[in-house]
């Protein structure tokens, strides 16, 4: 299984959200939700031959007021919790030609027992959500070695 993650520098976050056609993941490696989502994301990215998913640690956004304001301005009202200065991770953003065309925050609504891993049904549901995102940016087509 290929790992498509490319870590973003702070200086690149806003540019990635405003330009091109790509996938950006805001997560937290110590967070259970992010750890549950990553294998599902890798599987779906590989299905689409997507070699690059940009990653930025959401803790860094919360600590940087200027970056936080810029990211929130770009994301708009798509966040579940618009009051808190943090994200419910993971946040997966699908960008096509500089526009957010799909956005998914957290895992799946049915995941309510945080002491357990995602069930197979929940993994399939999350994979379906991620597939919709990949389809929204490339009409189901992502060429090998291309950003998607």
Predicted regions and their residues:
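Structural recognition of the beta-strand scaffold that forms the well-ordered cores
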Residues: 23-26, 53-57, 91-94, 102-103
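Extracytoplasmic/secreted cell-surface and envelope-processing proteins
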Residues: 33-35, 63-66, 101-104
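Short, internal strand/loop/helix patches
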Residues: 70-85, 93-95
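Local sequence-structure signature of Cys/Sec-based thiol-disulfide redox active-site neighborhoods
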Residues: 12-55
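Thiol-based oxidoreductase modules, predominantly thioredoxin-like and allied folds used
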Residues: 5-7, 26, 50-74
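Non-catalytic, surface beta->alpha helical segment in thiol-disulfide oxidoreductase systems
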Residues: 85-148
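N-terminal "domain-start" segment that seeds a small globular fold
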Residues: 1-11
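Second-shell loop/turn segments in exported
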Residues: 24-30, 60, 114-117
């Amino acid at each position: 299984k290929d790992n498509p993650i490319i870590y973003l520098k702070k200086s690149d976050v806003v540019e990635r959200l405003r330009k091109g056609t790509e996938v950006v993941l805001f997560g937290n490696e110590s967070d259970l939700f992010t750890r549950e989502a990553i294998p599902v994301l890798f599987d779906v990215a590989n299905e689409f031959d997507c070699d690059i998913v940009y990653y930025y640690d959401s803790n860094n956004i919360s600590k940087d007021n200027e970056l936080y304001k810029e990211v929130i301005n770009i994301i708009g009202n798509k966040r579940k919790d618009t009051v808190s200065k943090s994200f419910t991770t993971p946040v997966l953003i699908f960008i096509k030609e500089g526009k957010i065309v799909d956005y998914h925050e957290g895992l799946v609504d049915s995941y309510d027992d945080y002491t357990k891993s995602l069930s197979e049904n929940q993994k399939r549901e999350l994979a379906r959500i991620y597939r919709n995102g990949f389809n929204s940016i490339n009409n189901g087509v992502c060429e090998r070695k291309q950003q998607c």
